[in-house]
Amino acid sequence: MAHPVHVGLKEATSPFMEELIAFHDHTLMIIFLISSLVLYIISMMLTTKLTHTSTMNAQEIEIIWTILPAIILIMIALPSLRILYMTDEFNKPYLTLKAIGHQWYWSYEYSDYVDLAFDSYIMPTYFLEPGEFRLLEVDNRTTLPMEADIRMLISSQDVLHSWAVPSXGVKADAIPGRLNQAMLASMRPGLFYGQCSEICGSNHCFMPIVLEFSYFXDFETWASYLYIVSL
C-alpha cells in the first residue's frame, strides 16, 4: 500500500510484479552507467585543451560505438522478452474472473461458479469505517484465493477503461466489444488496491478496485455464502 512521501514501486505480491521490479532495477542501473559515461565525456570535452583537427576517420572507435549500444540493447531486450512471455502464459488457471468496466463502476463474474457475479461501486465517504481509505474502498470487494493462478478477462460495456492493480503487476485495457486477458496471482493474503487507469469521463477517478486474497477455505466459504444469498 502506498503512503505519504512514498518513493518507488509498490511492494510486490505476485511473481509477475517481482520480475517487473527486478527488470526496473536492471534497466535503471544500465541507464545510470550510460549517463555517468556521457557526463564524464562532456566534462572532459569542456576542460581539455587537446584538439584533433586533422582526424578524418577512426574506424576502431566507430566499430566500438556501433557494437557497444547493440550489446546494451540486447541486455535490456532479453529479460524484457522473458517477462513478456511469462505474463502471457496461461497454464491451467484455478479460476477465471471477468471484469467489465462501466461508467463508473466495475462488475465481476466468476465464470467457474454458478450465478456468482456482482457490481463494485466506490464507497461514499460517510460510510467509511475508521482505518479505511477514502476514494479507494468499495462496497463489494473482489475475493480471490491466494497462491493460485487466476485468469482475468477484461472488457467494457461503454467506453475505454483500464483495470490496474500495481501490487499484482496487472494493467489491462478494457475495450468495448473485445476481451483482453491477463494472469493474476498473489503469494500472500491481504487487501490490494487499484484504480481505473484510462480516462473514461467525469468520474474516472471514482472507479477503485479492491482485491481481497484469502486462503482457499475462506474463499470457498465466501463463494458459497454469496450463492446462498443470491437464491
From Swiss-Prot:
Positions contributing to Cu cation A1 binding: 161, 196, 200, 207
UniProt keyword Translocase present: yes
Mitochondrial matrix topology ranges: 46-59
Residues the record lists as binding Mg(2+): 198
InterPro entries assigned to the protein according to its UniProt record, in alphabetical order: CcO_II, CcO_II-like_C, CcO_II_C, Copper_CuA, Cupredoxin, Cyt_c_oxidase_su2_TM_dom, Cyt_c_oxidase_su2_TM_sf
Listed transmembrane segments: 15-45, 60-87
The record's free-text note on cofactor binding: Binds a dinuclear copper A center per subunit.
Membrane side Mitochondrial intermembrane: residue ranges: 1-14, 88-231
Stated family: Belongs to the cytochrome c oxidase subunit 2 family.
Function field: Component of the cytochrome c oxidase, the last enzyme in the mitochondrial electron transport chain which drives oxidative phosphorylation. The respiratory chain contains 3 multisubunit complexes succinate dehydrogenase (complex II, CII), ubiquinol-cytochrome c oxidoreductase (cytochrome b-c1 complex, complex III, CIII) and cytochrome c oxidase (complex IV, CIV), that cooperate to transfer electrons derived from NADH and succinate to molecular oxygen, creating an electrochemical gradient over the inner membrane that drives transmembrane transport and the ATP synthase.
Subunit structure, interactors included: Component of the cytochrome c oxidase (complex IV, CIV), a multisubunit enzyme composed of 14 subunits. The complex is composed of a catalytic core of 3 subunits MT-CO1, MT-CO2 and MT-CO3, encoded in the mitochondrial DNA, and 11 supernumerary subunits COX4I, COX5A, COX5B, COX6A, COX6B, COX6C, COX7A, COX7B, COX7C, COX8 and NDUFA4, which are encoded in the nuclear genome.
Protein name: Cytochrome c oxidase subunit 2
Protein's gene: MT-CO2
